[in-house]
């Protein structure tokens, strides 16, 4: 399995790894065992913990009603150029909205929750609105699966409400 996927990545002229998780058996399979243990920038996948933290801290009370006003800066991704709720922002992967959410959460609270979640290397260096995009935060694919599985099971150390709303959006 792993060798076949590695060949496919190579054939596409790219480097990557696929990590799958069989929920019922707690079985993790990886196309590249070395890369599956190497931390990478979480980039867009950080929208999940960022959403949980926003809900838990009250930065967002209602994912369908709290509105983040567009800052008026025209960006190349057209769907970003408008007001968003948390639900609409995650649907179009609106980085500027999530950067604003992170600024409102603040470094102290963000660090607290990354520590509570045991999320990757927990390093928010590089700026409160950049650490998951270009900064110091790293998480490997196996850690990502563990985090998402804890959210799936509702066992993260935050309220059930924040977890349920995040799963819903």
Residue ranges and their predicted role:
Residues 55-72, 158-163:
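Short, well-structured active-site flanking segments
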Residues 39-64, 89, 144:
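Active-site SXXK
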Residues 1-7, 39, 103-108, 152-169:
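Structured C-terminal helix/loop/strand segments within mature extracytoplasmic catalytic/sensor domains
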Residues 1-38:
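Beta-lactamase-like hydrolase cores
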Residues 33, 67-73, 125-133:
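Short linear capping/connector segments at secondary-structure termini
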Residues 85-93:
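Short helix- or helix-capping micro-motifs
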